[in-house]
From Swiss-Prot:
Major site of localization recorded for this protein: virion
Gene name for this UniProt entry: IVa2
Region (Disordered): 1-64
GO BP annotations, alphabetical order: DNA-templated transcription; nuclear capsid assembly; regulation of DNA-templated transcription; viral DNA genome packaging via site-specific sequence recognition; viral release from host cell; viral transcription
Keyword Phosphoprotein: yes
Known function: Component of the packaging machinery which encapsidates the viral DNA into preformed capsids and transcriptional activator of the viral major late promoter (MLP). Binds, along with packaging proteins 2 and 3, to the specific packaging sequence on the left end of viral genomic DNA and displays ATPase activity thereby providing the power stroke of the packaging machinery. The activity of packaging protein IVa2 is stimulated by protein 33K which acts as a terminase. May be the protein that pumps DNA into the capsid powered by ATP hydrolysis.
Entry binding sites for ATP: G168, P169, T170, G171, S172, G173, K174, S175
Pfam families according to UniProt: Adeno_IVa2
Basic and acidic residues bias spans: 11-25
Protein name: Packaging protein 1
Length: 449
């Protein structure tokens, strides 16, 4: 069972100009640390004061065109290029300074936006205009799903069931991450019952239990009108139930019709969330729990329609454990909708994961993503990078969760479009370079005769 509920989001009808300003503010999301502000200033817009949109002394000389075509190109020079050029420069500068950029083909580009406008040619300008429209359409469609600050308002946007894996070494803040996801309203709908599964109940310190109870209550409320607080679920205080792994895998808990099924009892009240922590050793044994990842959620929802949310979070310390006798971890990876990864994970495991899930992206964008992981592993603590297999929007397929700034889309789809534009510009310039070389050789031969 997989469904998407209605989005309780603010519809934001941003224009292209507003989106351009918003994107301009975010242009330095990932750049060379030695020159963080070198590309942040916008390129000055050329002054086109004549009626045709081009000054009389403009360096842009085009063949005679129909009025409609001429206006389109004038608009392109005045609007689209001013939007695209700083982003193209930023991406090219970033890629050229990547530690792993030795294998990348260097891309040729124009020196300035004026050179691009004057020398690109009609064909390239039309391609730039077409890709600009695709890019703006993508940004406009993502805007209603984001907060005014540009953050994601939910991890799953009512996608059900939510099966997620949290990868992180000891001390990376996995338990704090799970509490923050619940207390910051990033799980939709908010669970009314949370099952905390550990190998042994006595291994949970009292301070952690107090933190869980406090943040569950915090996540159950939101601001209402006239400085009031309103519960987000059908209960005033969500329940926290601790279970051992053996209790989780008890036979009666697989049968939704069994009167002792603890999950069925909770599903009668509302949404539930199951968190499996510190159980990687038990997951690798013979007993299968794969039903909790695919068959069990649909049966539970069919029998208890009031259970509108079913979330499972499984914590792993190793992205590729060797011991998986029952296939639990392999099945979990297949069924998982979200892979929440700490940049502190072993680099070779992170690289293997990225190579597996970015095959449709250009190699340069894959290297950029690896460098983002490497940068955050060395400079920032308690941040996370999330891969979503079923994103609400393509810009949210890869997301970045910062302790202070919240959950942000990484816009790798936009970076892919920009990189493809750089490749088109490079192709045109290299073709002209070959033509000039061939023409020079021909002239030399004629001169020698």
């Amino acid at each position: 069972m997989e469904s998407r509920g209605k989005h309780r989001l603010k519809k934001n009808g941003e224009s292209k100009e507003n989106l351009g300003e918003h994107e301009q503010a975010r242009i330095g999301f990932h750049r060379n640390g030695d020159s963080a502000d070198s590309l942040s200033s916008p390129v000055a817009e050329p002054n086109f004061s004549s009626p045709g949109g081009r000054s009389s002394n403009s360096i842009l000389h085009c063949p005679p065109q129909s009025p409609e075509q001429g206006n389109n190109l004038d608009c392109l020079v005045g609007e689209e290029l001013q939007f695209l050029w700083p982003r193209l420069q930023c991406l090219q500068h970033t890629l050229s300074n990547l530690p792993l950029s030795e294998g990348l083909k260097p891309l040729m580009n124009f020196e300035t936006v004026e050179d691009l406008a004057a020398l690109a040619g009609k064909g390239l300008l039309q391609e730039l205009k077409h890709d600009y429209e695709i890019l703006c359409k993508s940004l406009n469609s993502a805007a209603p799903l984001l907060s005014p600050e540009g953050n994601c308002e939910s991890l799953n946007y009512s996608l059900q069931p939510l099966i997620a894996i949290v990868y992180g070494p000891t001390g990376s803040g996995k338990s704090q991450l799970l509490r923050n996801l619940l207390s910051c309203h990033l799980i939709d709908p908010s669970p009314e019952t949370v099952f905390f599964v550990v190998p042994q109940i006595d291994m949970i310190p009292p301070q952690e239990m107090s933190a869980w109870n406090a943040q569950l209550v915090e996540g159950n409320y939101t601001c209402g009108p006239q400085q009031t607080i309103v519960p987000k679920s059908g209960t005033l205080k969500p329940r926290l139930i601790t279970l051992t792994y053996d209790d989780l895998t008890a036979d009666h808990n697989y049968d939704v019709t069994h009167p002792q099924n603890i999950f069925a009892q909770a599903a009668q009240r509302g949404p539930i969330c199951i968190i499996v922590d510190e159980c990687m050793e038990e997951l690798g044994k013979h007993k299968s729990i794969a039903k909790f990842f695919h068959a069990f959620p649909s049966k539970l929802h069919d029998r208890f329609p009031q259970c509108t949310g079913y979330s499972v979070f499984v914590v792993l310390h190793n992205m590729n454990p060797r011991k998986d006798q029952a296939g639990n971890i392999a099945t979990l990876k297949i069924q998982s909708k979200c892979h929440i990864i700490s940049p502190k994970m072993q680099p070779s495991q992170v690289a293997r994961f990225i190579n597996t899930y970015t095959k449709a992206m250009p190699t340069a964008i894959t290297l950029l993503l690896k460098d983002i992981f490497h940068h955050n592993a060395n400079h920032i603590n308690y941040d996370w990078i999330i891969y979503n297999t079923s994103p609400e929007h393509e810009c949210m397929q890869w997301m970045y969760l910062h302790p202070q700034n919240g959950l942000m889309p990484m816009y790798l789809n936009v970076q892919t479009i920009l990189y493809q534009l750089l490749e088109k510009i490079d192709k045109v310039l290299r073709q002209r370079q070959r033509w000039n070389t061939a023409y020079s050789k021909k002239c030399d031969k004629l001169a020698n005769k």
